[in-house]
Amino acid sequence: MKISLISATSENGVIGNGPDIPWSAKGEQLLFKALTYNQWLLVGRKTFDSMGVLPNRKYAVVSRKGISSSNENVLVFPSIEIALQELSKITDHLYVSGGGQIYNSLIEKADIIHLSTVHVEVEGDINFPKIPENFNLVFEQFFLSNINYTYQIWKKG
């Protein structure tokens, strides 16, 4: 199963401040929507609570608290390991979309990283991990917006 991390970060590495994303760059979330349409998303419980269920996506939520969901597009797992094991039986591609602990746990297992850097420095308590040295930048595009951002694709190799 191919694992892709997808995130937006500030120039100083912040991805969140509690449950909030501390910026709103017009157009940046369209990249997320386009890439994750009809895909499986692996998220932690706090990220899932803050983002809710987006249409045309399936969710694997990791929660040690044993939450449940009646939504047919949401599966809950007690650990990342069990989630990966079970998801490998039903999909060949998984998008990891947060939060910080999930990114830190899976960045070494990722095959691809989709990263938007929003050109602003903000305060926050959740940071994206350092991209490992065995990843190579294979694509980069700058976007003009109310807050400019750069979208990058990194591949393990």
From Swiss-Prot:
<protein>
    <recommendedName>
        <fullName>Dihydrofolate reductase type 7</fullName>
        <ecNumber>1.5.1.3</ecNumber>
    </recommendedName>
</protein>
<keyword id="KW-0814">Transposable element</keyword>
<dbReference type="GO" id="GO:0046452">
    <property type="term" value="P:dihydrofolate metabolic process"/>
</dbReference>
<keyword id="KW-0521">NADP</keyword>
<keyword id="KW-0560">Oxidoreductase</keyword>
<keyword id="KW-0046">Antibiotic resistance</keyword>
<dbReference type="GO" id="GO:0046655">
    <property type="term" value="P:folic acid metabolic process"/>
</dbReference>
<dbReference type="InterPro" id="IPR017925">
    <property type="entry name" value="DHFR_CS"/>
</dbReference>
<comment type="similarity">
    <text>Belongs to the dihydrofolate reductase family.</text>
</comment>
<keyword id="KW-0487">Methotrexate resistance</keyword>
<dbReference type="GO" id="GO:0031427">
    <property type="term" value="P:response to methotrexate"/>
</dbReference>
<dbReference type="GO" id="GO:0005829">
    <property type="term" value="C:cytosol"/>
</dbReference>
<dbReference type="InterPro" id="IPR001796">
    <property type="entry name" value="DHFR_dom"/>
</dbReference>
<dbReference type="GO" id="GO:0050661">
    <property type="term" value="F:NADP binding"/>
</dbReference>
<dbReference type="GO" id="GO:0006730">
    <property type="term" value="P:one-carbon metabolic process"/>
</dbReference>
<dbReference type="GO" id="GO:0004146">
    <property type="term" value="F:dihydrofolate reductase activity"/>
</dbReference>
<dbReference type="InterPro" id="IPR024072">
    <property type="entry name" value="DHFR-like_dom_sf"/>
</dbReference>
<comment type="pathway">
    <text>Cofactor biosynthesis; tetrahydrofolate biosynthesis; 5,6,7,8-tetrahydrofolate from 7,8-dihydrofolate: step 1/1.</text>
</comment>
<dbReference type="Pfam" id="PF00186">
    <property type="entry name" value="DHFR_1"/>
</dbReference>
<dbReference type="GO" id="GO:0046654">
    <property type="term" value="P:tetrahydrofolate biosynthetic process"/>
</dbReference>
<comment type="function">
    <text>Key enzyme in folate metabolism. Catalyzes an essential reaction for de novo glycine and purine synthesis, and for DNA precursor synthesis.</text>
</comment>
<keyword id="KW-0817">Trimethoprim resistance</keyword>
<comment type="subunit">
    <text>Homodimer.</text>
</comment>
<keyword id="KW-0554">One-carbon metabolism</keyword>
<feature type="domain" description="DHFR">
    <location>
        <begin position="2"/>
        <end position="156"/>
    </location>
</feature>
<keyword id="KW-0614">Plasmid</keyword>
<dbReference type="GO" id="GO:0046677">
    <property type="term" value="P:response to antibiotic"/>
</dbReference>
<dbReference type="InterPro" id="IPR012259">
    <property type="entry name" value="DHFR"/>
</dbReference>
